[in-house]
Amino acid sequence: MIEHNPTTIYGTTIVTVRKDGKVVIAGDGQVSLGNTVMKGNARKVRRIGKGNVIAGFAGATADAFTLLERLEAKLEQYPDQLMRASVELTKDWRTDRYLRKLEAMMLVADSKVTLALTGTGDVLEPEQGVMAIGSGGNYALAAARALIETDKSAEEIARKAMNIAADICIYTNHNIIVESLDAQ
């Protein structure tokens, strides 16, 4: 878990759901500086590459943008190979002195795979089609897992999970941004 430094800007909860031919990443819009909400409508989920990859990030905002840019560069180097680009990014992240200090995590997805990327070099795939990161990640993950076997769509599950996380976590708000792709 990322420790909260009161002088660092944080962005918080991201959840991904893969179900019934869709993959969704949803995130809230709150950015906090210590105990203060600095912005309520930040966009922490976006399309990258040629629009065929969606990414969501949690952690220190500037660090997350740095990693997002690096992932886009890896996707240019390894087009249509999200797994390979992600592994190469995490190798750099783990071994580069500058990158190693970055405090952020990312969830990324394309039509074939969903991954969590961490600064410890982990590239993780979800077992049950759901993953979540950030300060409200555990709440969102529990909610999404509880709903994955229902008849709700991937987007409905992601939105409900984010709303539950926002009800519980003070670093997460109800301004939810959702991006989705068709999945295999």
Curated annotation (Swiss-Prot):
Catalyzed reactions per annotation: ATP-dependent cleavage of peptide bonds with broad specificity
Entry GO MF terms: metal ion binding; threonine-type endopeptidase activity
GO biological process, one term: proteolysis involved in protein catabolic process
EC numbers for this chain: 3.4.25.2
Source domain of life: Bacteria
Subcellular location: Cytoplasm
Active site: residue positions: T12
Enzyme class name: hydrolase
InterPro entries per UniProt: ATP-dep_Prtase_HsIV_su, Ntn_hydrolases_N, Proteasome_sua/b, Proteasome_suB-type
GO terms under cellular component: HslUV protease complex; proteasome core complex
Keyword Cytoplasm: yes
Activity regulation annotation text: Allosterically activated by HslU binding.
Binding-site residues, Na(+): A166, C169, T172
Main location: cytoplasm
Alphabetical UniProt keywords: Allosteric enzyme, Cytoplasm, Hydrolase, Metal-binding, Protease, Sodium, Threonine protease
Statement: the UniProt record of this protein carries the keyword Repeat: no
Pfam families tied to this protein: Proteasome
Entry similarity comment: Belongs to the peptidase T1B family. HslV subfamily.
Assembly and oligomerization: A double ring-shaped homohexamer of HslV is capped on each side by a ring-shaped HslU homohexamer. The assembly of the HslU/HslV complex is dependent on binding of ATP.
Function: Protease subunit of a proteasome-like degradation complex believed to be a general protein degrading machinery.
UniProt-recorded name of the protein: ATP-dependent protease subunit HslV
